[in-house]
Amino acid sequence: MFYHCSSLIEINLGKLDFALSNDFSYMFYGCKNLEKLDVSYLNTNNSKSFRHMFFGCSKLKEINVSKFKTTNCENIFGMFARCSSLESIDMQNWDMKNINNIDYLFIGCSKLKNIKMNFNNNKKLSFGGIFYILPKDGSFVYKKGNNCEKLLKKLPKSWKITQE
């Protein structure tokens, strides 16, 4: 939709209806000057993919995706890749049971310090390169019993890991 809109700085999508949208892939890909974006109201009920949705949005410090409905989602490959100013992300309320690809989710997110995720006992996830090029002093919050064992092994030893 806004693929490579490199001059885009701020956008308000409040009046657009996304109820029938099933793919948000590449929506803001390459919007390297985007500083302000509110996607908290997006209707993502039918979405199957958020692949590279925010790829290269290097000036975004925060992205509120905490209310995304992800029951039907299968792919979040590189969703926040190269969001080099992103400081924290809350995906704790996401339904991850159908997601099978989170590879390179945070690649190049060099300022990311706080991640909240929930894996809903998803045993089929691929974690290839999920934390590649992350700082060594971040924090990760997870809920007990949510299949985080594979992922926890990939976190840097210096990270603060908290179980809720």
For each feature predicted by the language model, list its residue ranges.
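Structural signature of tandem-repeat unit edges
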Residues: 6-21, 32-48, 58-74, 84-100, ...
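Small-residue (G/S/T/A) turn/hinge positions that recur once per unit in extracellular repeat modules
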Residues: 1, 22-23, 27, 49, ...
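Short, aromatic/basic amphipathic alpha-helical patches
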Residues: 129-131, 147-161
